[in-house]
Regions:
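Conserved functional hotspots at enzyme active or ligand-binding sites that engage polyanionic ligands
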Residues: 1-115
Length: 115
């Protein structure tokens, strides 16, 4: 498994363990989970990355595409996309398939009204 310390080889669609937030409030995701990098590869040099958290508790929908992660179906919460310092990212957990990345793109376009 690749460490998050090697960010220069990271690409859109990579999945990392997300370290627990210290002060999640309201409906913000808490606890241990994963995050999908949704930021364009051309901007990986920035000090923060755009990531979308995952959950096993939400129902699949157009804005919660389902991906397979370590043999389990999880949903990507694209409406909760946020900027994080790459140092908040833990271990590399995998990479989305091309089909999964297309579903993420569709969900992001819907949530951001980019159609």
């Amino acid at each position: 498994m690749r460490s998050a310390k090697n960010w220069t080889n990271s690409v859109r669609g990579d999945v990392y363990r997300l370290k627990r937030p210290r002060s999640a409030q309201g409906h913000e995701q808490q606890g241990e989970r994963y995050a999908v990098v949704v930021q364009a590869n051309a901007y990986e040099h920035l000090s923060t990355w755009l990531v979308a958290p995952t959950t096993t508790k939400s129902f699949g929908s157009m804005i919660h595409p389902t991906i397979e992660l370590r043999g389990q179906d999880v949903r990507v919460l694209v409406e909760q996309t946020t900027a994080v310092d790459p140092q908040r990212l833990g271990d590399f957990a995998g990479r989305l398939s091309p089909g999964e990345l297309i579903e993420i793109n569709v969900a992001l376009r819907a949530v951001l009204d980019l159609e």
